[in-house]
Amino acid sequence: MNTTNTNISITLWGAGTVRTLRPIWVAEELGLKYQLNPIGPRTGETRTLEYTVLNPKQKVPFCEDGEFKLSESMAICRYLVNKYGDESTLQAPDSIEQQAKQDEWLSFIYGELDETSLYVMRRHGALAENYGEAPAAMIAARDYVIRQLA
């Protein structure tokens, strides 16, 4: 259902990571007008009093749509599509079965690939300075992703 509204007051918080890119990408695909506050996850910006009042989890991404507030990239993306999508942009599945298959795929990507492997590789690769090196974990995570996508 596309809620055509010229007074859309969406604010997206977060930038610089795949998880923060997801809601931005969906908002762009939907042609939504939004304000971006590009704060980073490891910069201290999520720990400010202003941001903590908005989002006590102190994580990004975060979405404000008027008075409605939501965190978690997958939840934000689904919310934006369900509220603002239509046949000319992105739209929610037509049936419960299609929704279930979408949920299955999203759960696999987020739970199986991202949390168990891709994030391990990011932590101990690009973010090794923060989290430490773990070559064995990197190899195991990479091999797991390859097996799952084969």
Regions found by a protein language model. Name each.
Residues 21-25, 74-78, 100, 111, ...:
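A structural signal for well-ordered alpha-helical segments within the folded catalytic domains
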Residues 52, 77, 81, 103-106, ...:
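Non-transmembrane alpha-helical segments in soluble domains
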Residues 97, 105-150:
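GST-like fold's C-terminal all-alpha helical module
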Residues 29-33, 80-84, 109, 121:
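Generic structural signal for hydrophobic core residues of well-folded globular domains
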Residues 73, 77-99, 107:
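Helix-adjacent hinge/juxtasegments
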Residues 1-75, 132-133:
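N-terminal G-site of the GST-like fold
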